Amino acid sequence: MRELITGGNELVALAAIESGCRFFGGYPITPSSEIAHEMSVELPKIGGKFIQMEDEISGIAVALGASMTGVKAMTATSGPGISLKSEQIGYGFMAEIPLVVVDVMRGGPSTGLPTRVSQGDINQAKSPTHGDFCSIALCVGNLQEAYTQTIRAFNLAEKYMTPVFLLLDETIGHMHGKTLIPDFEDIKPTIYNREEFKGDPKDYQPYGVAQDKPAVLNPFFKGYKYHITGLHHGPSGFPTEDEKLSQNLIDRL
């Protein structure tokens, strides 16, 4: 075990990098800004990319785009940012794009209390956008879990090919203290990486999977052609109005 004296937001950033995250896109917002700061410092050291965008919407859009290339990606925000990101979150659910969305909760609704603690975004994480789908949301209860639950969030996002919410409140995000976290060598064997289709490109259908399986989206630029859309789609990803295909898609999501 490693003994560290650090903060909750900083532990989220550390765990993200040790999970294999190599892209962060976002926009600074209290009380999550320390995550963006840490990623901006540490990612360039290991060949990763950090982009601060002009707003919350573009912040998640670039993170989704990075994930489509096969890179593990993350964005971080607070409640008002989740409200702005909701359309793109829905796109991530529909297109089955893995992404970790960190929400360091503060008082709301609206601008609320930016520097005070609240835990009012749990229902928002369960149903962040319109339509029928299942959302995965993990809640952090202490400094150690800021690290371990971040690892878990990335593993779930990659396994189930979906956006995953990581929720912590302002107190844990800004809390500094001593905590024990697993050694990286112990964490390394538990890291999950998304599946890839290895067969003939002519046979590749990213959404042509069993009802209990997620899509298999090969990284862009590797010779496999497919379509990604927020519309209801068939096995190849192209839009469809076929009743059975649409219902099977929603049931699977």
Positions of predicted regions on the chain:
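A broad, structural surface signal
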Residues: 14, 18, 22, 37, ...
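Conserved thiamine diphosphate
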Residues: 116-170, 194-195
